[in-house]
Amino acid sequence: MGGRFRDRDWPWIQLGQGDAAHPGAYGASMRSMKAILVSFVALVIEHSQAARAEQPVAPMWQLAEAPFQLEVTVLSMEEKPLTERITNIWHRVKVKRVFVGSGLSVGDELAVVSQVFDNPPGATSSSGDRGPFNGPNGLPAKGDHARIFANGSAKVLKTISPNGWQLPDQMIAFIATDDEYRSDVTMPFIAKLIARQGIARTSVHFSTGDDGRGSSAKEPDMKARTGLTDDLGLRRADSSVLAMRRSELGYNQMNSFASVTRHGLPIVGFRNSLQAFGFPGDGEGTKWWNDAFPVETWGTRWRSQCGRQSKTRIVAPDAEARRHPVLSGVSIPAEGLVVPSSLFRVDPLPPDCRVLLWGEAVDGDCPEAERRQPILWVRELPRKSGLPPQRIAFTSLGHPADFLDSEVRLLSIQMIAWAIGEEARMDDAARLTIRTAQYLPPEVQPPATVKP
């Protein structure tokens, strides 16, 4: 099931998500339905083999697609041996924050069961590894604060030790597949600044190829389009930053991508993420990810640019825009700020998008009426079950030389901090650190590594 998506694979992934935004999936052709049945039979065989190999539960990277992501306080813990090598560990927890999930509110108490195996560290089963806490098998103890990624119901959740339990600070997944604008250089730089300011933990996932067995290769390859380094790690993130360009991710990789981008979690985009995917073919799923995903997420799509050699003048924001946390403390002179990014032309934004910065083409070849375009905007989309709105921020800036400017660096960090609700961390000291951070442009930067 690895490799690049084919058209017939798409209805399967859409039906699996159960997303009403994809009505085309429910009118799939007979060819697509046949592929679904074939995939289903393959999954049954796969799971039967796993059962015979005494794999009692699915690995956490599958459960991470389930509908619960919570921040909790542990009230109690109890170990209950199930077999000679399997122990159920029951936690009683109190909900502090609901990121994803229905039927739960802040203050609710519920049970969480985790299975611990006596596998040695590094065994094939993920449960043989240790979690980040000091309890049994790295699980949290009484009084600990933790994040839960779990399946189950609003009364009893089930997860797998230790991957379903994470430290309470947020994790942002940076997805860097834009080879044209060297996201392998710019995104690690931004991710480091985010982590150093204590805004969130970060991971960077680079473009790579397929290992030939349906999984991503381990080493970055920015010319490849079908894989992401540590793509399963996306499922442990609770927000994402995209710097993508025309990716053609495989089936497993798209499952991971959807887990962090299709559940109302915060999402931030740079530059070519207006055209994040470039799947071949004209199937319903192909069209949705290529064309509808950017519109549904960012509110618009890429149309063209005002000349590849042109630049953009960032227009000084008005007083109302300056009061937004994304632009707090950002200094754009009255005459504007010229940056190397060419100006992108986009379709008109919907009313729920709030433009914070406009740009004007410098030495561009756009028609006069289109030489002024939005270059940074935010939106908040409502969510069900009383959850806070999804925060989304996008900028068409992102040329690697843009980040030589301290104000572009600052607004980039503040976009992310606002999206995940951590804008209060951006004080004057933090802004000074970001402005004075050393940035190496691509021409002197070493190649991307898995751990930037």
Give the predicted meaning of each segment.
Residues M187, F270-C366, D428-P452:
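An acidic, glycine-rich "communication" segment
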Residues E79-K80, V98-G101, V116-P120, S153-K155, ...:
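Solvent-exposed loop/turn segments at secondary-structure junctions
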Residues W10-W12:
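Tryptophan (W) side chains
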Residues A35-H47:
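Bacterial N-terminal signal peptides
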Residues A173-I175, D179-F277:
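Helical hinge/lid and interdomain linker segments adjacent to catalytic or ligand-binding clefts
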Residues Q49-D169:
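Transition segments tied to proteolytic processing and entry into folded domains
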